[in-house]
C-alpha cells in the first residue's frame, strides 16, 4: 500500500534539497531516518519531517508496520520563486531570488491495495 506525504513551498531551493533526497532514495524507512538525523544540512530537517509524516499516514490510514516500510518514490520539484530587491551603490538595485521547493515522499510496505 502506497502512502504519500508532501511539503509544498519549502523555503529551500530544489537543488539543495535534492542533495539530501539522493542519500535516502530507495532505502528502508528506519535506515533513512537514521541517515537524515546525522546529515548536517537544513534540507535534511525538511525531508525528515515529510518522511515522518508519510510514516504516520501509513500507520494511521493503512495500518502499516514501520519496519517494513520502504521509500518507493521521493522527488523534489521547484516551487514559486519570491523576488526581492537589494539596494546597491549609486541608486542601483539587485534582484534577489528566494527559491522554494515542493518535497514529495511515497512510502510502501510492498503490499498491493487489492490484498486487503
Curated annotation (Swiss-Prot):
GO cellular component: cytosolic large ribosomal subunit
Keywords in alphabetical order: Ribonucleoprotein, Ribosomal protein, RNA-binding, rRNA-binding
Source organism superkingdom: Bacteria
Pfam families per UniProt: Ribosomal_L22
GO-annotated molecular function: rRNA binding; structural constituent of ribosome
InterPro entries documented for this protein: Ribosomal_uL22, Ribosomal_uL22_bac/chlpt-type, Ribosomal_uL22_bac/org-type, Ribosomal_uL22_CS, Ribosomal_uL22_sf
UniProt GO BP: translation
Described purpose of this protein according to its UniProt entry: This protein binds specifically to 23S rRNA; its binding is stimulated by other ribosomal proteins, e.g. L4, L17, and L20. It is important during the early stages of 50S assembly. It makes multiple contacts with different domains of the 23S rRNA in the assembled 50S subunit and ribosome. The globular domain of the protein is located near the polypeptide exit tunnel on the outside of the subunit, while an extended beta-hairpin is found that lines the wall of the exit tunnel in the center of the 70S ribosome.
Record's subunit section: Part of the 50S ribosomal subunit.
Family of the protein in this entry: Belongs to the universal ribosomal protein uL22 family.
Protein name, per record: Large ribosomal subunit protein uL22
Organism of this sequence: Hamiltonella defensa subsp. Acyrthosiphon pisum (strain 5AT)
Amino acid at each position: 500500500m502506497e502512502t504519500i506525504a508532501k511539503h509544498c513551498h519549502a523555503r529551500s531551493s530544489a537543488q539543495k534539497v535534492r542533495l539530501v533526497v539522493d542519500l535516502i532514495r530507495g532505502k528502508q524507512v528506519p535506515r533513512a531516518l537514521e541517515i537524515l538525523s546525522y546529515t548536517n544540512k537544513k534540507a535534511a530537517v525538511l525531508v525528515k519531517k515529510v518522511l515522518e509524516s508519510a510514516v504516520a499516514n501509513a500507520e494511521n490510514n493503512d495500518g502499516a508496520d514501520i519496519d517494513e516500510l520502504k521509500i518507493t518514490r521521493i522527488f523534489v520539484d521547484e516551487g514559486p520563486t519570491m523576488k526581492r530587491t537589494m539596494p546597491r551603490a549609486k541608486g542601483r538595485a539587485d534582484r534577489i531570488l528566494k527559491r522554494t521547493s515542493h518535497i514529495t515522499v511515497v512510502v510502501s510496505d510492498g503490499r498491493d491495495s487489492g490484498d486487503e
